[in-house]
Amino acid sequence: TDYTLANGTLTISAGSTSGTITIGSIVDDSLDEANETVIVTLSSPSNATLGSDDAHTYTITDNDSAPVVDFNTTSSNGAESTSSKALTVDLSAASAQDVTVDYAVTGTATGSGTDYTLANGTLTISAGSTSGTITIASIVNDSLDEANETVIVTLSSPSNATLGSDSVHTYTINDNDNAP
């Protein structure tokens, strides 16, 4: 609950022209969230007529910073025989909103199933969560003697978050084949 206010009756004393309804105890939480509204509606007056302005909307403006999104490590490696690699993307704090971040895939390894499978995309970290995973899948254990190859994943264009300094992760596929 972000505030306290119960249904009730407003009494305007004889001779007065106004009364006050107090929204009490607005909670200053630390959760990044959208602005929220409280709508107070007047109804069923006695000894008076209800005017056209029978509702008031009060906006609780969120004052919390959006979380930072970035990789929890900037590099990792594994042998060709590793079938997949999960890259963890972290938020600095949970958010009350879904966070999305785009990612682009580059590097010296060839995607589309030749060396691995992972296309450019968008990661969604659900509201309340603090991390998500991008998976480099189907890492191919070929029999070619070749140099180690890299898969570079770069984060960009977050929504409901700001981009952190660790926005690039380099995964190295270590060749495990002997020279002919």
PLM segments and residue spans:
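Short boundary segments that mark the start of a structured unit
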Residues: 1-180
